[in-house]
Structure formats: C-alpha cells, structure tokens
C-alpha cells in the first residue's frame, strides 16, 4: 500500500453536499448513486456496528518505474496513430489486488488485536470513499 489511514464514520457534514449533488442530477446515468442516496454517507448503516474505517491507497505504478513514464504516456496520447489503454486497466484488476491486500491487512490486525468484524471494499460499496480517505489523511 502507498498510504493507510483511519477515519471515523460520522459523515453527517457531507450529507448536504451529497444530497445537492444528487438533486442536481450530476450522477447522470449512474442510477445506483441515487438508489443508495444518503446511505453513502452512513457507513454504519452498510455494516452495522462500524466504528472506524481503514482507508488505503495503492499507486498504479511501482516506485522504481522512474519519472519518465508520464512523458511516455503523454507522447502516446499525442500520437493519433496509437491506441492507449488507461494505466489503471493494465495488468491485474486493481479491485482484486487491493481486496487481497486489504484482507491480508485485516488478518494481520486480527493477529495483533484479536478478532474484529470487518468487510473489505474496493470501489464496490455505496460509501463516500474520497470523503473517508480525506478524513483519514
């Protein structure tokens, strides 16, 4: 993981912004956004008993990739003869990679502190990931 943080689950301050965003129709054709509504700002409704959320960030490229990759990507994008696959879509599905690593993290934590309830999400649940990650630092 590139970064790990912990956040509380009280996202009440984010609810008005989420409600306004949905009311304005900014979710477009992503109907699931409206379907879950304000539940996204209430992690404890999704997993009852939730007291904290561990957030994790994983970079798409390894650190030893060097700084030239951005230049290489921009050159490829500027060439109309080339098709470019987004960086996140190359290699193994990041959902599976993150899910596996987060599950291992939960198991290691349980070894240290004892069993605890948890559920691993990787862009797969109706939660405000960015809000939680921001609060987690």
Task: Enumerate the language-model features and the residues they cover.
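Auxiliary alpha/beta "docking" domains used to position bulky ligands
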Residues: 1-137
